[in-house]
A protein has these predicted regions:
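N-terminal carbohydrate-binding/catalytic regions of secreted carbohydrate-active enzymes
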Residues: 1-7
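A post-motif C-terminal structural segment
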Residues: 32, 36-301
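Short glycine-rich loop/turn motifs that provide flexible caps or phosphate-binding loops at active sites
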Residues: 4, 27, 268
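Mobile, glycine-rich extracellular loop/lid and propeptide segments
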Residues: 10-14, 18-21, 25-39, 60
Length: 301
C-alpha cells in the first residue's frame, strides 16, 4: 500500500526510535541507500506514500536523530520548495557532512552524513544518475535496486565489497556510546540485498551478504565488550524465492556458489531472526513480525 509510518487512518504511529528517544536514549540510523528510503524513513517519518521523498526529508529534520549516515542529498537540497534542508539541520545544531572523509574524522556528537550513492555502495561507481519517477529526486542503481526496479545488474562490474557499512556502523557506535549512561537505539540497514533478490542476481547477493557479515562480526564484538547491549538481526521479507539447488560437484574442483530464484518479487517465506546479548532469549521460536518491536521496546525499558 505504500504507507510509511502511518496507520490505516493516515495518523503517524510511534516508532521504536521515537520510543527510545522518550526513554532518554540516543538514536542513530546507518544505511547503504538513501536516508529517505522506506526502511530508514519508517523510523522517523509518517507519509501515505513511501515515494514522498521530499516530505520524508523534511520530516527527517524534525526527527531528533543524533547520528545518521546514508545517501540521498537531492531530496534535501534540490527541492520544489527551494528550501535547503542541510541549512535547516545546521540551524538545529547538527554538523552536516557531504563527504566520507569528514564523516570518518568528525568528533561531533550530533551529525548527519549525506553522501553520494557511489560512496555508500560499490555498484554505483559507474552507474548513471537518473530522475526518480515520483518526485525528481536523484536515484542511482543501488537506490533503484532497493526500490525493486528491474535493472540488468549483470552488466555492472562487481568490485570487491566496500567497507562502507562496517565503517559507518563503527562511527555511529563510537558517537552513540560516548558519554552515554542511558543507552542508545541504532538501526542499520543493508538495503541492497533486497534489490539483488529482485534482479535474481546471485553474485550481487552473495557479495552483499559478505559485506553485511563483516558488519555483523563487528556488532557481535561490540556486544561482547558491552554485555548490556542487545543485537537483533532480521528482515522485513524475503525477496526472489532464493535457494540453493541440488547439484553434483567434482571433488577437488571448487565451484562458485550460484543461488536459484523462483520470482523477482517478494515472497511469504518465513525470515530468520537472530538475537545476541541481553534479552536474546525473548526471540526464540516463531514470532509475528508485529510483535518484534513490542519485545524490543520492553527490553529497552
Amino acid at each position: 500500500n505504500g504507507f510509511l509510518g502511518v496507520g490505516p487512518d493516515s495518523i503517524q504511529l510511534e516508532s521504536l526510535l521515537k520510543k527510545a528517544q522518550k526513554m532518554g536514549k540516543k538514536t542513530g540510523i546507518v544505511v547503504n541507500t538513501t536516508l529517505t528510503e522506506a526502511t530508514p524513513g519508517a523510523f522517523y517519518a509518517g507519509v501515505t506514500s513511501r515515494k514522498e521523498s521530499y516530505t520524508i526529508a523534511k520530516q527527517f529534520t524534525e526527527s531528533g536523530v543524533d547520528v545518521a549516515i546514508g545517501a540521498g542529498l537531492s531530496a534535501f537540497i534540490n527541492r520544489p520548495d527551494s528550501v535547503d534542508l542541510t541549512a535547516t539541520l545546521i540551524e538545529k545544531g547538527y554538523n552536516v557532512y557531504l563527504d566520507w572523509k569528514s564523516v570518518l574524522k568528525t568528533s561531533s556528537d550530533k551529525f548527519v552524513g549525506i553522501l553520494s550513492m557511489g560512496d555508500v555502495h560499490r555498484r554505483n561507481k559507474s552507474s548513471n544518475t537518473t530522475a526518480g519517477a515520483a518526485d525528481g529526486a536523484e536515484v542511482c542503481l543501488a537506490a533503484k535496486l532497493a526500490a525493486g526496479s528491474e535493472e540488468n545488474a549483470d552488466t555492472t562490474r562487481l568490485s570487491e565489497p566496500t567497507v562502507y557499512l562496517e565503517k559507518a556502523t563503527a562511527k555511529a557506535l563510537e558517537v552513540l556510546s560516548r558519554n552515554n549512561q542511558q543507552g542508545f537505539f541504532l538501526m542499520i540497514e543493508s538495503a541492497i540485498i533486497d534489490g539483488y533478490g529482485h534482479n535474481n542476481d546471485s553474485d550481487g547477493m552473495i557479495e552483499e551478504m559478505k559485506e553485511f557479515d563483516c558488519t555483523l562480526k563487528q556488532l557481535v564484538a561490540y556486544v561482547n565488550q558491552h554485555p548490556e547491549t542487545l543485537l537483533v538481526v532480521t528482515a522485513d521479507h524475503e525477496t526472489g524465492g532464493t535457494g540453493v539447488t541440488y547439484n553434483s560437484f567434482e571433488v577437488g574442483n571448487p565451484t562458485p556458489l550460484k543461488l536459484s530464484f523462483s520470482t523477482k518479487g517478494h515472497t511469504g517465506t518465513v525470515v530468520p531472526i537472530f538475537a545476541y546479548g541481553a534479552g536474546a532469549e525473548a526471540f526464540a521460536g516463531i514470532i509475528k513480525n508485529t510483535d518484534l518491536p513490542k519485545k524490543i521496546e520492553e527490553l529497552m525499558k
